[in-house]
Amino acid sequence: MQVLPPGSTGGPSRLFILRPVATTLLMAAILLAGIIGYRFLPVAALPEVDYPTIQVVTLYPGASPDVMTSAVTAPLERQFGQMSGLKQMSSQSSGGASVVTLQFQLTLPLDVAEQEVQAAINAATNLLPSDLPNPPIYSKVNPADPPIMTLAVTSNSMPMTQVEDMVETRVAQKISQVSGVGLVTLAGGQRPAVRVKLNAQAVAALGLTSETVRTAITGANVNSAKGSLDGPERAVTLSANDQMQSADEYRRLIIAYQNGAPVRLGDVATVEQGAENSWLGAWANQAPAIVMNVQRQPGANIIATADSIRQMLPQLTESLPKSVKVTVLSDRTTNIRASVRDTQFELMLAIALVVMIIYLFLRNIPATIIPGVAVPLSLIGTFAVMVFLDFSINNLTLMALTIATGFVVDDAIVVIENISRYIEKGEKPLAAALKGAGEIGFTIISLTFSLIAVLIPLLFMGDIVGRLFREFAVTLAVAILISAVVSLTLTPMMCARMLSQQSLRKQNRFSRACERMFDRVIASYGRGLAKVLNHPWLTLSVAFATLLLSVMLWIVIPKGFFPVQDNGIIQGTLQAPQSSSYASMAQRQRQVAERILQDPAVQSLTTFVGVDGANPTLNSARLQINLKPLDARDDRVQQVISRLQTAVATIPGVELYLQPTQDLTIDTQVSRTQYQFTLQATTLDALSHWVPKLQNALQSLPQLSEVSSDWQDRGLAAWVNVDRDSASRLGISMADVDNALYNAFGQRLISTIYTQANQYRVVLEHNTASMPGLAALETIRLTSRDGGTVPLSAIARIEQRFAPLSINHLDQFPVTTFSFNVPESYSLGDAVQAILDTEKTLALPADITTQFQGSTLAFQAALGSTVWLIVAAVVAMYIVLGVLYESFIHPITILSTLPTAGVGALLALIIAGSELDIIAIIGIILLIGIVKKNAIMMIDFALAAEREQGMSPRDAIFQACLLRFRPILMTTLAALLGALPLMLSTGVGTELRRPLGIAMVGGLLVSQVLTLFTTPVIYLLFDRLSLYVKSRFPRHKEEA
C-alpha cells in the first residue's frame, strides 16, 4: 500500500479515491438510471404552462347577438362568476352563437374546474331559452391554442353532407377517444339534414301560415316511449311508425285539408336532403372539404397524442369509401420534433467543443478523458431526476443541458488542474489526488451552491413565466449538483489511476508550442496585473464606469416578451364589410385563397366561412396557412406574411390579418394579430363613444401596426316595430310574430330524426331566392283570432338600422379588444409605453378601464419582476457565499464581477439586433453564476496563501491570479463554447435559442477580460477596509 504524506486526507473524496470499484459501480448506476429515464421522458415544444381553460359553446340558430347576450350568455356568466379559482371569464355573443371562455388559476386542477363548470351549467339550465336545439357544450381546450393536427376530408363524387356524416360517426369519434385529445371540431357545416323551404305565396294562397306547417311537421315526427303489454305468459313491446326518415316521407306529409282534399308538404315547399346550416363552408386548397381540427387537452403530451392519431388513421380511412380522401394538412409535432432534434445536435456539439478545449489546455489524452466522462455522466444522470419530477424533453430543458455542458466541466477541470499540479511537482498520483481533491473540495462546494443559489429566484417566479422556466432552472440545478458529486468522487479517483508524471510530461511538438504560448500569455497577464495593482483607483474607475454603463444599456435596450417562432403555420383572419353575406364571403375567400396558394412558400391552405362559435361573424373568415419545411423555403415566416399581405392587398373589400402560430399560447381567444389591449365599460353606449377615439389614436402611433378592434356596430338590421294595440285587437301576440320570423329566416331546427348511428335535424325556412332582402318580410303572414291570416305589414313597420354583429364581455362587462402588431423597428416595450401614454393623453373617464391581455399582459408582469429577479439572485448568492466564507466582505468582492457580465450581454444583444426578452434575461441570470466563479477561484487561493504561507494580501492575490489563470481561462472558454452552438443555431426553433446564446457569449467575453484585473484590485480594497474597521474597533477581533 502506498504511504500517504501527512495532510493528504482527501476530504469528502477520500473514500471514493480509495474504493475505485465502488465508485465505478455507483457512477454506472447513475448512468443506467439516466439512460432508462431518457426513454420514459415525453417530448414537447415547451414545458407544460397552460392555464386550466374551459370553453362553453351554445348554439341558437337565428338569434341575434342581443338575444344571445341577454338570453344565453348572461345567465351562464352569472353562474360561472360564482366559481372559485376563476381567473378570467370572457364571452362573445354573435348571431346564433354564444362562446364563454373560462380561464382558471394555474394551481386549480382541470378536473376540479370541469366539475364546477358542469354544476354551473346545470344551475343555469332553467334560465336558458326552452327551444335551444342543444344544451351548452363545454370542452377542456384553450380556443386560442392552435390545433395539434389539421386533417382535410374531400371527395370528388360524394356530397359533403354524406362525407361529414361518415367523418363524424367513423373518424371524429375515434380520434376524440385518443388519450390527450381535448376536442375534435369539424369545420364545414355540412351535417346532413332535411331542409323544408316554404313557398310563402303557396302557403298564403291556401290560408295557411308557417306556424301551421311547423306544428304539422313536429306532430308527425316523434320518438317517445310507448310502453309494453305484459300478459300471463308473454310480454310485448309497443312500437309505431312515428318516425319519418327521409325527405320523400316529409314531402308526402299531409299538413292540412283544403275543401276535403289533402294538402301535402311537397305542395307548398321544396323538401330536400341538404346541410343543417347552409351558411357554413370550409375549403382545403380551394376544394370543398370537411376540415378536422384536433386540439389537445391542457397538459397532454402533444407528441404521444399526435403519434396515436397517426397510427390510427390508416385503419380509420379503410372504413371510408375509396372516393373519400383524408389528408393531413398540418402537424405541429413535425416542427417540434425538428426543433428538439436541432437542440439535441447543439447539445452534442457543445459537448464536443468543451472536450476539445479541455484537450487544448491539458494536451493529455488521459487528462482529457476524465472530464470527457464527467460531462455526459452529469447530463445523462439528470434525465433520471427529470422523470421523477414529471418533466419533458423540450427546448428549454435541452437548452439547460446545453448550457450545463460548460458548467459541469468546470468542476472537473478545477479538480484535474489542481491534482495535475501536484503530480508535476513529483508527488505520487494517489497522494496528489488525495491532497488536490481535499484542497479543492471547499471550492467545488462553493462554486456549486453559489451557482444553484442564482437559480433559486427562478423557482419562485409567479404565474406563467415561473411555470415556463421552472423545468429549465431545476434541470440545470440538478445537472450542476450531479456534476459536483462526480467531480468529488469519480474525477479524483480517475486522476489517481490514470494520471502520472510520465503522461503529464510527455509532450509532442504541438504540446510544447501550446505550452510556450500559455506561458507567454500568463507572463503578459502577470505584467499587466502588476501595473493594475499599482494603479488601483484607475481600475476602480473602470469598474464603476462598467456599472453605470450596464444601467444605461438596460434602460435603452429594446425589451420584448418571448421570441416569435417560425413553426411553419400561419393563422389568418379575413375581414370584410360588416354587411357582407355568406355568399359574398365565400367568393372573397376564393379570391384570397388563389393569391395565397401562388406563393412558393405555401404548402397548403384551409379556409372557413360562417358562424360556428370559433368564427364569430359572417363578415369574417378563418384561414390556416401551412408553409413548407424551413429547409424547403427561402424565407422565414415574417417575410412570408409580409409577402402574402401585399398580394392580397389589391383585392377590394377585404383586410387580411396574419400571425405565426406559437408554442407558447397565453391568450384565451383567437386574435387577428399577436398582441391585445382591451377597453372595458359598464355599458355598450360608453364603449361606442370611446372605441373610435382610442382606435384612431392607436392607429396613428408609429410603434404599432395593423391596429384593429373587434368592435362591429355597423351591421345591417331590420327592426320590426310592431303596433302592439293592432296586434292585440287581432289576437296576435309577440310570440306569434317571433315564431313566424324564426320559421321563415332562422334556419329553425324544428324536429329530430333519430337513427341507430346519429341524429339529424329537420330545418324549416322560407324559400327567399325570388325575394331577396327586406322584400322577403312581405311574405310573412300571421293567424288572427278568427282563424284568418294577416300580413305582417298590417301590424308592423319595418325599419332598417345598424346593430352590433357581436357583443363581447370580459368578467361580465362589455369589452372591446384592440389587436396590434409591432413593426420591426420597435419593440414590444416601446409599443406598451406608447399605448400607456396615449391612454393618459385621452383622459379616459373612471368608468372606462383598460388592460393588456395575453402575452402583452405577461410581458408587463415579467418586465416588472425582472429587476427584482436579478436582485433576488444576487442576494441569494451573497447569502450562500457569506455562509460558506463566514465573511461579510468576501462575497462583495466576488459579486463585484457581475456588472461586467451585464455589459457584455446587453452589448451583444444590441449588436445582434435582439430584444431583451425573458430568454435573454435568463441568460444574464446564468451569467451571474458563471462570472463569479473566476473570483471564487482567485479568492480561495489568496486566502489559503495568506493563512498557510503567511503571505501579504497583495502577494497572495497576485500569486492566486497567476496560479488560477489557466483554469479560469479554461472554464470560461468551456462555458462560452457550451453557449456558442445556441448563438449560431440556424435550424427550427432558433428564435428561441439564439437570445440565450448571444447573452451568454457576449457576457463571458467581456467579463473574462475585465474580472481578471478588477477582482484583485477590489479584493485589496476590501482588505484595507477590513483592517481599517479592525483598527477603529479593536474589541471586534472576529475576522470579517
UniProtKB/Swiss-Prot annotation:
Membrane-crossing segments per the record: 15-37, 345-362, 367-389, 396-418, 438-460, 472-494, 535-557, 867-889, 909-931, 968-990, 1000-1022
Membrane topology of the entry: Multi-pass membrane protein
Main localisation: membrane
Matches recorded under SUPFAM superfamilies: Multidrug efflux transporter AcrB pore domain, PN1, PN2, PC1 and PC2 subdomains, Multidrug efflux transporter AcrB TolC docking domain, DN and DC subdomains, Multidrug efflux transporter AcrB transmembrane domain
Top-rank taxon: Bacteria
GO terms for MF: xenobiotic transmembrane transporter activity
Entry's localization field: Cell inner membrane
GO cellular component, one term: plasma membrane
Subunit text: Part of a tripartite efflux system composed of MdtA, MdtB and MdtC. MdtB forms a heteromultimer with MdtC.
UniProt similarity note: Belongs to the resistance-nodulation-cell division (RND) (TC 2.A.6) family. MdtB subfamily.
NCBIfam families referenced in this protein's UniProt entry, alphabetically: PRK10503.1, RND_permease_2
Protein name: Multidrug resistance protein MdtB
Organism: Salmonella typhimurium (strain LT2 / SGSC1412 / ATCC 700720)
